[in-house]
């Protein structure tokens, strides 16, 4: 059984036992988190939401919080001596999907 959930402005396909990286959540490590915005549940009994599946939720456990690799943003205007260099590290949360309830 799998589901498509919406979190952090993205849609993610998840299965029980899978570990996913999502946008940072305000939750403690080893704490449980519930995703109520379930768009689709697949498997033997398919349920399609319009836009959400009623009564469906996905339960997971927070494994860790972290920051992604650094990216460099560089702006430049040719021949004008304008240069701006900036780095960014996006925070994330790693979640282990425990079960899908539909």
Swiss-Prot record:
GO molecular-function annotation terms? rRNA binding; structural constituent of ribosome
| Entries under InterPro entries matching the protein | bL21-like, bL21-like_sf, Ribosomal_bL21, Ribosomal_bL21_CS
Q: Which domain of life is it from?
A: Bacteria
Write out the entry's keywords from A to Z.
Ribonucleoprotein, Ribosomal protein, RNA-binding, rRNA-binding
Report one GO cellular component: ribosome
Pfam families assigned: Ribosomal_L21p
What PROSITE patterns does the database record attribute to this sequence?
RIBOSOMAL_L21 (PS01169)
What GO terms in the biological process aspect are recorded for it?
translation
Q: Which residues form a coiled coil?
A: none
Q: What does this protein do?
A: This protein binds to 23S rRNA in the presence of protein L20.
Q: How does it assemble?
A: Part of the 50S ribosomal subunit. Contacts protein L20.
Fetch the NCBIfam families from UniProt: L21
Q: Which PANTHER family match?
A: 50S RIBOSOMAL PROTEIN L21 (PTHR21349), LARGE RIBOSOMAL SUBUNIT PROTEIN BL21M (PTHR21349:SF0)
Query: Could you say which protein family the record assigns here?
Result: Belongs to the bacterial ribosomal protein bL21 family.
Name under which the protein is recorded: Large ribosomal subunit protein bL21
* Gene symbol of the encoding locus: rplU
């Amino acid at each position: 059984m799998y589901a498509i959930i919406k979190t952090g402005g993205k849609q993610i396909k998840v299965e029980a036992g899978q570990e996913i990286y999502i946008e940072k959540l305000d939750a403690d490590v080893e704490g449980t988190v519930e995703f109520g915005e379930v768009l689709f549940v697949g498997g033997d009994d398919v349920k399609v939401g319009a836009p959400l599946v009623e009564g469906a939720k996905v339960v997971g456990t927070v494994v860790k919080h972290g920051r992604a690799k650094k990216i460099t943003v560089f702006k430049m205007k040719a021949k004008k001596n304008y240069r701006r260099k900036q780095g960014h590290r996006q925070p994330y949360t790693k979640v282990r999907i425990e079960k899908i309830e539909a």
